[in-house]
Amino acid sequence: MAPPKDPPVLRNLQATADLLDALQNDPSLLNDEEFIKRLSILRQKHEETTNFLAKKLGAPPLPTMMTSSEITQHRSSYKVTKSSSCHFQDEASPSDYQMPRHLDLKPRSSEVRVPVRAAPEPPREQSWSQTEYATLAHNQSHEALYEDPRHQVHATSSHQNPRHQSSRHHNIESTAPSQVSVTSSVQSVAALSGQNPRQQVHATPSHQIPRHQSSRTHQNSRQQVPSATSSTLQNPRHRTSSASRHHSTRNATSATVRQILANASTRHLSSAPHIATSVAMPSGLLLSSSNTKHVASSKSENPQFATSSHVVEESFLEDGMSTTREVPTIRDEVVAGDLKLSKNRSKSMHQLSKYTPQVTVPKPFQLSLRKSTGNTYAKKFMSGLITEKQKLEEDAKKALENTKFRAKPVPKSTYQPTNTFATEQKYVEAMRKKVAAKARRKFEVQNEMVRSKSEGNLASIKPLGYVPPSTYISPIPVKPNARSRSATMRATILIQEATTPKGIKSHRAQSNLTHHLRHGRCTMDASAVSLHRRTSPPDFEKIHAKITDNFRNTNSKPSTVPIPFKFASRSKSATSRHGNCQEQAPKPFKKSTENLPKTSKNRVPSTHATQLREELNRAKIELKKSEKSGKNGNFWAEDNKQRISSFLGARSKTEEDIAMRTKQKLQQQQETTQEYMRQLAEMKQRVLNGPLIMEKQTALAQEHRLKRKFEERMKSAKGRGIERVQSQEKQQSIGRRSSEVSGSGTFVVDKGYEESFESEDKSEKSGSSTPSESGSGSESENESRSSRSSKPKSSKSTSSKSSSSRSTSSSSEA
């Protein structure tokens, strides 16, 4: 049979953390074989990583292996014993190289056996899982054990006195092999909870004892527990502080996790002893057995505990490959039978919370940006300009503060309306709009319901989808060289849209700005240099006093009264608008004659006649001026009228004009409908007045009959003149055509037209005579009249009368 395969396991630190979390939540997983296998596989992977790192550093992989003994259950009490044995190579073995200090992994410890006894046994009703998951509250006992010098180490042996055992404790290093074996018994949670926290736990280190002697020592130690508790209660020195009790409860969970890991390794190693083990560190990492280093103990030092100067941290990638790195700053301690020694530990042990595995929470940070190396002269120049500008602004601010007149702050009513009437009106209008919209929506719904009942729901009709034009029109074939032409077009478009890089533009603008700032003072601004005539400065005090007096003496400002005005009817001409812009020629110089003294002349004395003449001349001149001004005024008035009329004619949108136009259109439409009805009535009357088809046929048949008779008579009458006959035929043809046109207007029979009834007449022409024929013609007329008289309409009677008149005229001609 093939050996059972291990389950597929994700071999990374996250998987290990997940297993430990699951174990804390559900301690019953220790009974699951698959869970134990997964945990051991992860430990093996971490040990392989440790050996890989040792190989990279040049050190050979050590054949050390830490095993855990099985859990022994006594009849009287539940005891959890864990013995760790570390087998090392002999120190005397020669080595070709000298190991560095931080990689010296050779044993430096002696054989120590420390059985730790806890409180009395728990009741038998408790399950094994509760005992296994019990909290080990022994930190207080260890601190009291190693801090109080009055405590003595009780050693028991099969050959020696217990008093001499402690003295010979450190002298066995040369003879016995290096072993560290720790046995401890754990009580349940219920027993510990009821126990006094001040009670101490005795630890008796000893050598290996036979089985029967070890049972005796257990009984002796069980008897010593009450005395120890009483002594600790009486002696105040054994009382521990509340801080130490809080520290022990805080470390209980980590000790529980380590104890569970040890038990799990014990169960799995019984089935697979070839798998190497590793030690769970308090910081959350796993320390393999090949990476532990035991430190030699001396008489002045505390009992043994192992440290790891280099902990291998391992990170697995998604493809299964792993990367390892050393963390040389962390110094953890190996848990030997859950005996955690708090004395003389490193400073990093106090900061273990930093290295415990936690959920990664991203924290914001800023990248370190290198400052740009700028021009020192430009920086100095710009800083000088900035300081100068700040100084000028401060001076201007001080001068503004020292002024006598200051502007009052803008009132709130400039931006916020103080009168609530406008806001109330707006609110009322908004509410009216809302109410009107609701009412309109209600009526729209009702109208839609009525319409849908009468016309059907048009919204339910699905519109047709998009039909491409290629369905009806064949697509245009691809032109030759279409791809090359599109490529060239795209290239031209990209060249047109291309711009220079952002840095070049900013650099150009910055360089122009710095050049202007640096050399702007050197250039002479002609616009700024304006030569003014020197004037004496005004007396500002007098001006201010005058302004204040005027301000005091002024009355309250009167309210604004609106004055009616008219807009400019016509815009200014281009010449008047641009008079200031255009250059004008200089006017010729003329001396003013106003201020010159008037020369005294000998004038003729005015008479009454001259005065009348002058008045008449002045009246004529004024009349001409008034006429001229009147002409100009009338011209502009007429021009404005024409402009207004053309403007209104171009865009007439008044209601009266619209009503007038609609009235005209309605009248025109009525007239056209009346005209159409009249034309239709005339056409109908014409159709009714026209002859029927049977009447036409009978008339044509009679005409053919008469024509044949006439030809027969002409043949019989040879003696008569031919010319007279020809003239008569011409007259008959003219009369026939006129009668055909007047009768039907559209139906014309050719000369060679013959019908079946004409052949019957030919067969009967020998026996027929003129009076009978005339009688037959009258009978046909009577039949036609009788058929038409059956119809009640008068129009048909008139048409029958006209047809009868035509038949009589044709018979008279015959």
Swiss-Prot record:
Compositional bias annotation for Basic and acidic residues: 99-111, 714-727, 751-765
Compartments, record wording: Cell projection, Cilium; Cytoplasm, Cytoskeleton, Cilium axoneme
Coiled coil: 606-689
Cellular component GO terms held in the UniProt record: axoneme; ciliary base; ciliary transition zone
Major localisation: other
Cytoplasm recorded as keyword: yes
Tissue expression summary: Expressed in amphid and phasmid ciliated neurons.
Covalent S-S links between cysteines: none
Compositional bias segments (type: Low complexity): 174-193, 766-779, 795-814
Biological processes, Gene Ontology terms: cilium organization
Keyword Coiled coil: yes
Record field: compositional bias (Basic residues): 236-249
Chain intervals for the UniProt region annotation (Disordered): 71-130, 150-255, 569-610, 714-814
Composition bias, Polar residues: 71-87, 194-207, 216-235, 570-583, 594-610, 728-745
Keyword annotations from UniProtKB, A to Z: Cell projection, Cilium, Coiled coil, Cytoplasm, Cytoskeleton
Domain of life, source organism: Eukaryota
Family from the record: Belongs to the FAM161 family.
Identification of the protein by name: Protein fam-161
